[in-house]
Structures are given as C-alpha cells and as structure tokens.
UniProtKB/Swiss-Prot annotation:
GO terms for cellular component: small ribosomal subunit. Belongs to the bacterial ribosomal protein bS20 family. The keyword Lyase does not apply. It comes from Paramagnetospirillum magneticum (strain ATCC 700264 / AMB-1). This is Small ribosomal subunit protein bS20. The gene is rpsT. Residues 1-22 are annotated as: Disordered.
C-alpha cells in the first residue's frame, strides 16, 4: 500500500484512467461487432453504415492511446475490405 501522498494520488488517477479506457475499449468493440454482424447477415447497406460509425471510433481509440495507430488502421482496412468484398458479391 502506498504511503506517500503522491503515490496515493497516482493510484487514484490510474483507477480513473482504467475506468475510462475500459469504457472506450468496450465502445470500440461494440462498433466493430456491429460491422461484423452486418457482414455475417449479408446486409451491405447496414454493414456500410456500421463501418462509417466504427471507423472514427477506432481512430479515436488510437489517438487516445488505447490502440496502437497501426492496429487501428489495420482493423479499419480489414473491415473495409470485407465490406467491399461483400458488395462485389451481391
């Protein structure tokens, strides 16, 4: 257990940041899941709309330091490719 005032403060800050980051990660996963469900369902319009919502969330996560920027870009790229492939098959 921390005894110094500054160490106690750091613990409080870490707990707050952990909560915020956990919420952000959950939000990102939810948006990505919506895209994947739309792709699995075969609904290209819904997949495109979900992708338009998921892309900014992923990039905001990268900007906030939750995801590495390359990871966010890779996820966006793969989702875009899957939606594009789905459109071409339909």
């Amino acid at each position: 257990m921390a005894h110094h005032k500054s160490a106690k403060k750091r613990i409080r800050q870490t707990e707050r940041r952990t909560e915020v980051n956990r919420a952000r990660v959950s939000r990102i996963r939810t948006y990505v899941k919506k895209v994947e469900l739309a792709i699995a369902g075969g609904d290209s319009a819904a997949a495109q709309a979900a992708l338009q919502e998921a892309q900014p969330e992923l990039m905001k996560g990268a900007q906030a330091g939750i995801l590495h920027k390359n990871t966010a870009s890779r996820k966006v790229s793969r989702l875009v490719a899957r939606v594009k492939e789905m459109k071409s098959l339909a």
